[in-house]
Amino acid sequence: MRTTKVYKLVIHKKGFGGSDDELVVNPKVFPHIKLGDIVEIAHPNDEYSPLLLQVKSLKEDLQKETISVDQTVTQVFRLRPYQDVYVNVVDPKDVTLDLVELTFKDQYIGRGDMWRLKKSLVSTCAYITQKVEFAGIRAQAGELWVKNEKVMCGYISEETRVVFRSTSAMVYIFIQMSCEMWDFDIYGDLYFEKAVNGFLADLFTKWKEKNCSHEVTVVLFSRTFYDAKSIDEFPEINRASIQEDHKGRFYEDFYKVVVQNERREEWTSLLVTIKKLFIQYPVLVRLEQAGGFPQGDNSTSAQGNYLEAINLSFNVFDKHYINRNFDRTGQMSVVITPGVGVFEVDRLLMILTKQRMIDNGIGVDLVCMGEQPLHAVPLFKLHNRSVPRDSRLGDDYNIPHWINHSFYTSKSQLFCNSFTPRIKLAGKKSASEKTKNGRDTSLGTPKESENTLPIQVDYDAYDAQVFRLPGPSRAQRLATCRSVREQENHSRKSASSCDVSSSPSLPSRALPTEEVRSQASDDSSLGKSTNILMIPNPHLHQYEVSSSLGYTSTRDVLENMIEPPQRDSSAPGRFHVGSAESMLHVRPGGYTPQRALINPFAPSRMPMKLTSNRRRWMHTFPVGPSGEAIQIHHQTRQNMAELQGSRQRDPTHSSAELLELAYHEAAGRHSTSRQPGDSMSLNFSGTEELSVSLLSNSSTGVNPRTQNKDSLEDSVSTSPDPMPGFCCTVGVDWKSLTTPACLPLTTDYFPDRQGLQNDYTEGCYDLLPEADMDRRDEEGVQMTAQQVFEEFICQRLMQGYQIIVQPKTQKPNTTVPPPLSSSPLYSRGLVSRNRPEEEGQYWLSMGRTFHKVTLKDKMITVTRYLPKYPYESAQIHYTYSLCPSHSDSEFVSCWVDFCHERLEEYKWNYLDQYICSAGSEDFSLIESLKFWRTRFLLLPACVTATKRITEGEVHCDIYGDKPRADEDEWQLLDGFIRFVEGLNRIRRRHRSDRMIRKGTAMKGLQMTGPISAHSLEAAGPPVGKKGTSALSALLEMEASQKSLGEQQTTVHGKSSTQPAENSSVAMTPTYVDSPRKDGAFFMEFVRSPRTASSAFYPQASVDQTAPLVLDSTSLGVSTGQPMDRGNNQTFGNSQNIEQAFPSANSGDYSSQQHVASSLTSSSTLVEILEAMKHPSTGVQLLSEQKGLSPCCFISAEVVHWLMNNVEGVQTQAMGIDIMQKMLEEQLITHASGEAWRTFIYGFYFYKIVMDKEPERVAMQQPSAPWYTAGADDFASFQRKWFEVAFVAEELVHSEIPAFLLPWLPSRPASYASRHSSFSRSFGGRSQAAALLAATVPEQRTVTLDVDVNNRTDRLEWCSCYYHGNFSLNAAFEIKLHWMAVTATVLFEMVQGWHRKATSCGFLLVPVLEGPFALPSYLYGDPLRAQLFIPLNLSCLLKEGSEHLFDSFEPETYWDRMHLFQEAIAHRFGFVQDKYSVSAFNFPAENKPQYIHVTGTVFLQLPYSKRKFSGQQRRRRNSTSSTNQNMFCEERVGYNWAYNTMLTKTWRSSATGDEKFADRLLKDFTDFCINRDNRLVTFWTNCLEKMHASAP
């Protein structure tokens, strides 16, 4: 009951009363209101719509007679504070929304996450602009729809459809540069101007208004036909990209990439670039001035490479799970053509395109600049290269329902649109007249013969129609078909509504009425396809195949509408002009020559079959009054007020009838009456798209009310008269072009039982998720059966499946409720919403595969239905010429394969087992699961040098100026230890009382370096305030033993920004020979900051530094970093070393010295161990962590402790020796309890063996192989903890660049595994090295629990692969692979790592996997080609010499060249990127790869490592190499690629700005071609060094 009592409205701000509720109610004032009620608030006599809010909390202290509403909400609804309002409780059923649009930006939301977000919104209220948050996902409510009206607020029920629209999608814009671009349209605009100044300019403006941040790629494409008789007329080098078409003409397809994967605030500047390209274009694509080529002609748009272009983008979209970005969702291809949407295409390619597009849920928008024709578009004219032409067949056409098309009207056109009709319109006829003879004879209706001139229908409108989608859960498809005549008996005002039998030709359809101007689907939905209606066909019982042919042939599950005897299941059929009567016969796998006819001028008579493909995008759009999808960009110029009546339908109608009725109704025609004997075999192709819309709202289950039986018929008879179609125009679907919709989570197509039995094979398997709980390790989190069940649904959604929503009336299975609970809408109120339901069942579909997932008694049953006759999916090889974005005019020949993976082959059983195992080692991720993956690299931050370049430094080769000083290295190493601690989520104990008493404390576990500063990240926060690590304290202490003054010099010299000041550090070089130098694994660590390529063992004393000015192998990073001077004020004064030790307040400086002096290298191991255990002066032990035994320490810290506390231990190698002996004596052991024989220096956990575990020690005799004991424990330990070895590199005691050394440094034994000279780690040099290489794998794996902060209620885990070794001169790789993670939660974790890295002096950035992969590879991108930068060697060669390194051994030439190139890369700030060659990578090409310290750019040396003959060597070196092929092995230089993963989210001062990479490219290229003689200067400096050091 509604009350008229008024209350005062007060407003509150968010967070009022400790809650974020939008509505606060006093239960004393409103005794009848309870939690969960929906309350309607409105000012008396107010024209604005009332506000609906849900009561989530009651507050008794609110003043009398008031109700309090959140301020932001009152502003949206224009409610006035302190005014009177009515407050009424409303029934949720009356205010339930049909469709909610959520828009979001800069996030990746997987489909599984969307579904879980949708479920969290059920039983709540929504209002426009409302912010929605779930598990870190943020979205905002856009449009809300009830039936065909937009509303301001409403209630979300289980049946409400939620559509997600993304304002940061991946958008490919293809501009077809066919010959029409140079023509004028009828208004005098050049089509090119119309496209660029008109459409693109408008699009970019709309993006800006909507605040979009799409990642955009713009490509100009065209096809050039050559006047040639044979391939021999073309230059040999270009023949690869010349193709021959079905008519024997030679052609070449061109793609010029204008921008690639870019995000910009302002896109209009791009228009200028496109205009410049327009002027050069004829020359680029060999239409003019093409020497050596036959005469070329640009193709028309109809003969162009339209399908090929969109397939290139699909090759990228297919791989959306690779290089997964966390700040965009959605994929869209937009093709701008100067034509009218008619294309001549290859049949196989068309079918393949359709399969790929529909299955992958990609939106394709076709924007035509031409005049809208009077026939259906888009229209494909098919040519069959594969099947010999059959002389009986005419032309073959197809109207693709899956392409969303728009016609763009330029501003000048609008002025000319003042008059419309070209012929007189028919007057209205009475209903009785119309149905005489069972045929509508009004104007324009075709007669029986199909030769009558086609009626001119507006095809766009039809498109609209086609995409008229029905409401939410229309599964009435399951209904048994009742023929329409049964309805007629209910009550008919006029002649019967649809009879076909009386005349072969169904009335053609007129203007799709209101849909035309109706509201629209924007999005990349598959399209508003055009009017494809019915074709006259005498065989009434023949069920014909859909217009879009392709692979929805009648083999797709058929509707129940036709009784089985009449069903003719056929292979994909085709419509040919002239074969109207032909039946389709089944020949699985082959095509039949007889095909149905399609007449593009009267598509309304074309048969249309309902299939799951056609329904894939239906739930994206609101539904019109008669159930059709509403798409705003189809507008009609006629007033359709008559259609606005409210029509509801009888929920019992079968979908077929509804379709049919709606079809006619929408067409504004009445059909003839049906004879009683007729079976309902109506050719009813209601074009599903057309009208499936038609299914009524009521049947959707949203509002099951009593239906008015007459309403349907009435509306039919009063609908407007046929109206020639040209009065309707298709505009531009701006909504889909600005905020593309993601593929809907639900669909309503369900196959009938008969179809499932006849056409499908059924397979099922059961899983008992909770059965194996006992054998899992105790700590492993366990998923309940309900959680596993939901995860199964999520996984299917993630792979593109859709949940089939069925109407409430009929259940597919009598015992189990249909998806989303069959209970009456509101019986599960607010409270029960999250109650896990013991039983559940979901049906899901994708293409022609269906899954039924059932949970009963903790057992999950998965039933899969696969088609008995799968389609053969073609693989099409395509060759084209590509000009990448960084190149002005050079086209490269590329090839790719277009293919579509068969859905039937996905290993669901394996995936389901993987989910059940929740990350345990029984199942690991395999490539065929298409798991999501992102690769990250940890790079040493070089803020100073980067900043200098950003601020305008002319040259970029300022990174390798000075070698890193020791403290910097130590600092970095220490930072790395803190970073890995962060990965391991280890917190050091007693942080609060371990503050160092000096300027600022170091943060975290400082492992190295006089605590000079946060040396490498000036931009980062001041180095920590939280205490420090044992190592740093020890290093400090060591520093303090030297004179304070000297220390100050060093540190301050280092920290100054002027590199010149570093000279204060340079003292005379001292080379110390190490006892283990002979070839033991850890080579000597000379006390020289940078003589080794990556030796980063902290040196014992700073005063022996020998800076090496340039060492080619040390791809180090710039020193000269500004440091925070506050950090280094007083090194010498008594810093409390204690904080490094567990008991933080005992011990002082003198006792420390005492310990140090009492231990010598001759002390017994037990003595040293006792000193290590000392609570205040010993090694800092890790506090007890879950899963770590007590008394653990980190191996690198103990080695540094030994160096500082034991006399005579001066190098890491000696410290490692002592620890190695302890390990052998079993005084210490690896923390997993594993009896390793090797002590590994790095971030490895070891524990002190306590007396209380002698049995354990006895078990692990040294004689036992190191890998046997406790293998399971060990494996699970390794899956939980990150452990990284620190690589010791070979030292070169010399200032001479490596490439000029008389003998080259030894290289890793297996080149492929190491990829570069940088890591000279374990070469095959000694037994110790071999053992270590066995113990320390290249790559290790950890299973991470992602959701540390419990943001979600599911188990979230991912596999993390990381490098087993860390070297300061190489990037450290971390790869994440996942299936069961909420992307936002994972992103939150990685962002935490990113911040941690910054505070540790590093930079963590997402990078491309396989940046140099060829277009045809798994990681390749068909529109990306690497840029080659040649190295000008000719300027360095001496007169008469053939090779740069002629004075050395010939077999070292290549290695020297390689080292020389590395030295140049090092100067520019590149470090090595040892990408892991794992099972997931493309064929392991062992080409050395580098990444810039800013993470913005990759370099690759374009040749693999191998020995060459002298002749080859000479050729290689000549810059004018014979073969200039892109990927050839012949040129000396570098391949260059941008890291497109580095978006704004990840940028900081350490990555430089967006222009940084281009500046670097320009300067690097200048250096390599020897501009301003820079290359020669560099070379001569190197030679001088060599001569200077010669005796």
From Swiss-Prot:
Record GO biological process: cellular response to amino acid starvation; intracellular signal transduction; negative regulation of TORC1 signaling
Phosphoserine sites (modified residues): 505, 992, 1518
GO molecular function, one term: small GTPase binding
Compositional bias ranges of the Basic and acidic residues kind: 430-439
Gene3D superfamilies tied to this protein: Winged helix-like DNA-binding domain superfamily/Winged helix DNA-binding domain
Compositionally biased spans, kind Polar residues: 518-532, 1118-1149
Family annotation (Pfam families): DEP (PF00610), DEPDC5_CTD (PF19418), IML1 (PF12257), IML1_N (PF23013)
Subunit organization: Within the GATOR complex, component of the GATOR1 subcomplex, made of DEPDC5, NPRL2 and NPRL3. GATOR1 mediates the strong interaction of the GATOR complex with small GTPases Rag (RagA/RRAGA, RagB/RRAGB, RagC/RRAGC and/or RagD/RRAGD) heterodimers. GATOR1 interacts with GPR155/LYCHOS; interaction takes place in presence of cholesterol and prevents interaction between GATOR1 and KICSTOR. Interacts with SAMTOR; interaction is direct and takes place in presence of methionine, leading to inhibit the activity of the GATOR1 complex.
Domain notes: The DEP domain mediates the interaction with KLHL22.
Protein name, UniProt field: GATOR1 complex protein DEPDC5
Gene: Depdc5
